[in-house]
């Protein structure tokens, strides 16, 4: 029997255009209101059937952490054991999204794995079933399963489609250092002393969208700068290059600047690369939909 051709999919980065921490649950999870869109920095995953029934994951570049702790492996294992799948899978993961950068790379890889294996193994799980499984693996996983720019509320499980987003040109910068999400939220909690941002901005975002650079905001940004001054340096450098607005994504350390003009964005990115060899600098347009929308 001829083996089916491998499935190859992209796993894009996400950017938080706004992020407000509006509370904390008794179990320690923080409640958020955040608008997320995609950006064309992406990992690539290849999936091939394994008739032996095993789950095999290889990563490029190689990682030192246990493969069993990788969200890709955990997603495959969750589907295989949860639904009695006899077939296995060989997964090749090529990483481009930095770790600990606030871009959701691990969550994106996880979501792509759930979507791909739902097809490869013929599970025919619904979007709601996949979202429930994804949320159990990570709070950011559902937004990547949703495959559209969205407002996320709660711990990330309540998703609403966003109106059309501006055709901004972005310069996305990672300073080459990582931050612990737990550490950033802990520092933020110490700064606000339990007085979280009042909820309520979400409806305005849904009604009017995110149209202006001054709407960019991240409640975690101050805490991240305190823990990692390089974040502040990146934000300042983007403003110096003429960005109309700047913001940190997620819990950091990646930041981005928005530009109305593509030429200005390209020039800014080039200057930042020349002046900061250790920074990852990428210019591109914000994406309203997942690059693999309709392929699953």
From Swiss-Prot:
Catalytic site positions: 14, 140
Matching Pfam families: GHMP_kinases_C (PF08544), GHMP_kinases_N (PF00288)
Domain of life according to the entry: Bacteria
Binding-site residues for ATP, renumbered to this chain: 98-108
GO MF annotation list: 4-(cytidine 5'-diphospho)-2-C-methyl-D-erythritol kinase activity; ATP binding
Reactions catalysed according to its record: 4-CDP-2-C-methyl-D-erythritol + ATP = 4-CDP-2-C-methyl-D-erythritol 2-phosphate + ADP + H(+)
Keyword Nucleotide-binding applies: yes
EC numbers for this chain: 2.7.1.148
Pathway the protein contributes to: Isoprenoid biosynthesis; isopentenyl diphosphate biosynthesis via DXP pathway; isopentenyl diphosphate from 1-deoxy-D-xylulose 5-phosphate: step 3/6
GO biological process terms, semicolon-separated: isopentenyl diphosphate biosynthetic process, methylerythritol 4-phosphate pathway; terpenoid biosynthetic process
UniProt keyword list: ATP-binding, Isoprene biosynthesis, Kinase, Nucleotide-binding, Transferase
UniProt record similarity statement: Belongs to the GHMP kinase family. IspE subfamily.
Function: Catalyzes the phosphorylation of the position 2 hydroxy group of 4-diphosphocytidyl-2C-methyl-D-erythritol.
Alphabetized PANTHER family for the sequence: 4-DIPHOSPHOCYTIDYL-2-C-METHYL-D-ERYTHRITOL KINASE, CHLOROPLASTIC (PTHR43527:SF2)
Protein's name in the database: 4-diphosphocytidyl-2-C-methyl-D-erythritol kinase
